[in-house]
């Protein structure tokens, strides 16, 4: 059996300092590695009050520097926010400096309110209907 941990730098309210949240998150990642978990996942979120997670590659690079075995996954990178060449470069570099530990998750995002802030006018649900076209373009 394999175990995985999806964790964000999240807080329920602003009574917790984000540096404490970050420290606690790293401790959870290290405990997961020590406990034999095979993947830890970091998300991409923008302008949400509960979290600071604008770039999962930055979070995973930090975790890579503090771990040695656990695989590092993006859960997920929002395809609509990235140019494909930049995205490929970010993923390739993280995989290189982490010793080949990247698990790459690409998706359409979670919240329309993030799209409203990041890509005004683009509906998150529109991306759900273009997966066949995306699959063809990746072949």
Task: Report each predicted region and the residues it spans.
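Acidic/polar active-site rim loop that often engages polyanionic ligands
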Residues: 111-121
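Glycine-rich anion/phosphate-binding loops
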Residues: 80-92
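Aromatic/hydrophobic pocket-lining residues that form the small-molecule binding cavity
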Residues: 21, 25, 56, 84-87, ...
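Structural motif corresponding to the early beta-alpha repeats
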Residues: 73-79
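Non-cysteine beta-strand/loop elements that form the S-adenosyl-L-methionine
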Residues: 103-109
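Single conserved hydrophobic/aromatic residue that forms the stacking wall/gate
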Residues: 129-139
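N-terminal beta1-alpha1-beta2 module of alpha/beta enzyme domains
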Residues: 1-72
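Residues at the N-termini of beta-strands
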Residues: 39, 101-103
